[in-house]
Amino acid sequence: MTETEFLALVDQVLDSIESQADDWAASQDVDIETSRSGNVLTLVFEDGTHVVVNSQAAMQEIWVAARSGGFHYRYDGQHWNDTRGGPRLPDALSQICSEAAGVPVAVRL
């Protein structure tokens, strides 16, 4: 995939995550703040947990930084897969954000 295609795909992913986080605040009373600067999305939860999702265009990866560690995801045409064999991006973010929110939340991509 070209860099332009990758950046467009990442933009859609970050928009979707941000929109879902806003929905959690409205429908599940999750205390969360979102901020976006270019291809960096930061989620801040009531307990002070920060989750940062950003793109690395040169590697064509999405990186996630959370209390539990740093994770890298590469797109295979259908899914964002952990480069170390862990859960796919939506599953990992669902778990990370659920722990920070104190209630189950789901990320769907």
UniProtKB/Swiss-Prot annotation:
One cellular-component annotation, GO: cytosol
Alphabetical list of Gene3D superfamilies matching this protein: Frataxin/CyaY
Keywords: Iron, Metal-binding
Any Pfam family: Frataxin_Cyay
InterPro entries xref list: CyaY, Frataxin/CyaY, Frataxin/CyaY_sf, Frataxin_CS
UniProt KW Nucleotidyltransferase keyword: no
Record bears the keyword S-adenosyl-L-methionine: no
Gene Ontology annotations of biological process type: iron-sulfur cluster assembly
SMART domains, sorted: Frataxin_Cyay (SM01219)
NCBIfam families: FeS_CyaY
Family: Belongs to the frataxin family.
General function of this protein: Involved in iron-sulfur (Fe-S) cluster assembly. May act as a regulator of Fe-S biogenesis.
PANTHER family according to UniProt: FRATAXIN (PTHR16821), FRATAXIN, MITOCHONDRIAL (PTHR16821:SF2)
Protein name per its UniProtKB record: Iron-sulfur cluster assembly protein CyaY
